[in-house]
């Protein structure tokens, strides 16, 4: 047995401390199809070699601790330990590198995102030998994927339920997000749905506050849905936020939504927690409810480039835990999102098989083995002038959600919804006729304003509104080479 892969049991117990790399750095290791693979961005403290830092990550997120312990001799360390099997420098950074770590599948409980994250992104992120640590990507082996139920229904089943095909779905977050009474809230939902939207939505922090208790909101929103359906002949929905202070209340709200006969409920999966989310997803699957997922709190975890966890990992975890929609950024709106990176995790949400593609931030090939897909939701600071770009970027299998871009229309909520529906239909028709939305988008919208005064009014209001800030989360490049160019 080589010194690099020795087990403590094989050489007898010796009390004391030894370098992590002697046990957990194994560059000769050949990964198995059943291993969970992780790519960590590691920033070690000065004086800590990359090999030791990478091995420390593998150790502290699997079987290791700071000193040798005699109980190591009671198990097979080679079978259960994580292994740092590769290191690569980060382009343009002198003190960062990517550490590749393989974890044996037996370390994780079946069907539990909670347990997976507790190990992989647990205490190791506070390890003093590291200045910063970020989980960039995970490869989930098919053997582990098959232990998860995934989304309650998936993209195709949702389209069949709603009888809507060949275009993105349209939504609107009701604003102001806090302070409306339940009756006025329901009125706004009705006006938006009547005007042509497919969905309206509770904002992430609408739960059950003194100004609007959850049961009242559910009742008035259900009335709005049924009234709008009767008038338009289309199936409508409102994302009723079931998130609560405890799982029992969350399930009570989901049960009431089912009793009302509405098509969809909502959950804040990061603040609510993965255990609660998986339970709600299973209930939705068993009872025919779609599940919309909001990612509130994600930027606390994923926005800093050198520490935390990339959203592509949170997106994969959500697909495993369960959700039919999830917010994914817009690229063009007010929230963080670089184009190629966003398209990378959008594909990870929707597609069945995704090849490794570092140009889009995808570190590993991922096979979902027919786990249902998730619709990405583009939401945040978007309006009718963004419609061509959104349609071109996200394609048909997406939800485009305009809050202020609907309710801020100068003529009211229903005309705002009409403007968005007309803009979307114009873009879809132009695309189907072979026109290039990226280059002809503004012209397509202007042409549509000739037969839609509602769209013309919206275009006039928001013609100057842009959110042109550099994204924090960008692809790694060699800064010296970029300067020379």
Curated annotation (Swiss-Prot):
EC?
A: 4.1.1.39
Cofactors needed by this protein, per the record, are: Mg(2+)
PROSITE patterns in alphabetical order: RUBISCO_LARGE
Propiece span(s): 1-2
Q: Which superkingdom, per the lineage?
A: Eukaryota
Where on this chain does substrate bind? 123, 173, 177, 295, 327, 379
Q: Which residues bind Mg(2+)?
A: 201, 203-204
Subcellular location, record wording: Plastid, Chloroplast
Q: Name positions with the PTM N6,N6,N6-trimethyllysine.
A: 14
Instruction: Summarize what the UniProt record says about post-translational modification.
Output: The disulfide bond which can form in the large chain dimeric partners within the hexadecamer appears to be associated with oxidative stress and protein turnover.
User: What UniProt keywords apply to this chain's record, in alphabetical order?
Assistant: Acetylation, Calvin cycle, Carbon dioxide fixation, Chloroplast, Disulfide bond, Lyase, Magnesium, Metal-binding, Methylation, Monooxygenase, Oxidoreductase, Photorespiration, Photosynthesis, Plastid
Q: Where in the chain is the site Transition state stabilizer?
A: 334
Which residues are recorded as modified (N-acetylproline)?
3
Give residues where N6-carboxylysine occurs. 201
A GO BP term here is: reductive pentose-phosphate cycle
Which GO cellular component term is one of those annotated? chloroplast
The protein's GO terms of the molecular function aspect are: magnesium ion binding; monooxygenase activity; ribulose-bisphosphate carboxylase activity
Q: Which reaction does it catalyse?
A: 2 (2R)-3-phosphoglycerate + 2 H(+) = D-ribulose 1,5-bisphosphate + CO2 + H2O; D-ribulose 1,5-bisphosphate + O2 = 2-phosphoglycolate + (2R)-3-phosphoglycerate + 2 H(+)
Which NCBIfam families does the record associate with it?
A: PRK04208.1 (NF003252)
Subunit composition and interactions: Heterohexadecamer of 8 large chains and 8 small chains; disulfide-linked. The disulfide link is formed within the large subunit homodimers.
Purpose of the protein? RuBisCO catalyzes two reactions: the carboxylation of D-ribulose 1,5-bisphosphate, the primary event in carbon dioxide fixation, as well as the oxidative fragmentation of the pentose substrate in the photorespiration process. Both reactions occur simultaneously and in competition at the same active site.
Name the UniProt record assigns to this protein? Ribulose bisphosphate carboxylase large chain
User: What gene is it encoded by?
Assistant: rbcL
């Amino acid at each position: 047995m080589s010194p690099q892969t020795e087990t403590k049991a094989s050489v007898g117990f010796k009390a004391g401390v030894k370098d992590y790399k002697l046990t957990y750095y194994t560059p000769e290791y050949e990964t198995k199809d059943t291993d969970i693979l992780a790519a960590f961005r590691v920033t070690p403290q000065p004086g800590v070699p990359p090999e030791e830092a990478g091995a420390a990550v593998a150790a502290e997120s699997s079987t290791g601790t700071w000193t040798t312990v005699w109980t190591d001799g009671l198990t097979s360390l080679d079978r259960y330990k994580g292994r740092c099997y590769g290191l690569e420098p980060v382009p343009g950074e002198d003190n960062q590198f990517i550490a590749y770590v393989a974890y044996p599948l037996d370390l994780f409980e079946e069907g539990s995102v909670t347990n997976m994250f507790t190990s992989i992104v647990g205490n190791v992120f506070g390890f003093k030998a590291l200045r910063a640590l970020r989980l960039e990507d995970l490869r989930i082996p098919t053997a582990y994927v098959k232990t998860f139920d995934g989304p309650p229904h998936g993209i195709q089943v949702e389209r069949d339920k709603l009888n809507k095909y060949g275009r993105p779905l349209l939504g609107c977050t009701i604003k102001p997000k806090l302070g409306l009474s339940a009756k006025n809230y329901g009125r706004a939902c009705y006006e938006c749905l009547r005007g042509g939207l497919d969905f309206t939505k509770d904002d992430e922090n609408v739960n059950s506050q003194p100004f609007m208790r959850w049961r009242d909101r559910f009742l008035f929103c259900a009335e709005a849905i049924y009234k709008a359906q009767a008038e338009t002949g289309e199936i409508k929905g409102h994302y009723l936020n079931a998130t609560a202070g405890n799982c029992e209340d969350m399930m009570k709200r989901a049960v009431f939504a089912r009793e009302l006969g509405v098509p969809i409920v909502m959950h804040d999966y990061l603040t609510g927690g993965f255990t609660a989310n998986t339970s709600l997803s299973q209930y939705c699957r068993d009872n025919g409810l779609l599940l919309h997922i909001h990612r509130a709190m994600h930027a606390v975890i994923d926005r800093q480039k050198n520490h935390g966890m990339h959203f592509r990992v949170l997106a994969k975890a959500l697909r495993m835990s369960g959700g039919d929609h999830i917010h994914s950024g817009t690229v063009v709106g007010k929230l963080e999102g670089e184009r190629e990176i966003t398209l990378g995790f959008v594909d990870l949400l929707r597609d069945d098989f995704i090849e490794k593609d570092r140009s889009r931030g995808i570190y590993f090939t991922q096979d979902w083995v027919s786990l249902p897909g998730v619709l990405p939701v583009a939401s945040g600071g978007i309006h009718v002038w963004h419609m061509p770009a959104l349609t071109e970027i996200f394609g048909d299998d997406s939800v485009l959600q305009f809050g202020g871009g609907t309710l801020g229309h100068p003529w009211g909520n229903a005309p705002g919804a009409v403007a968005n529906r007309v803009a979307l239909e114009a873009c879809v028709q132009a695309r189907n006729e072979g026109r290039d939305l990226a280059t002809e988008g503004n012209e397509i919208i202007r042409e549509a304003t000739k037969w839609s005064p509602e769209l013309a009014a919206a275009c006039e209001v928001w013609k100057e509104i842009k959110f042109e800030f550099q994204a924090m989360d960008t692809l790694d490049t060699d800064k010296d080479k970029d300067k020379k160019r």
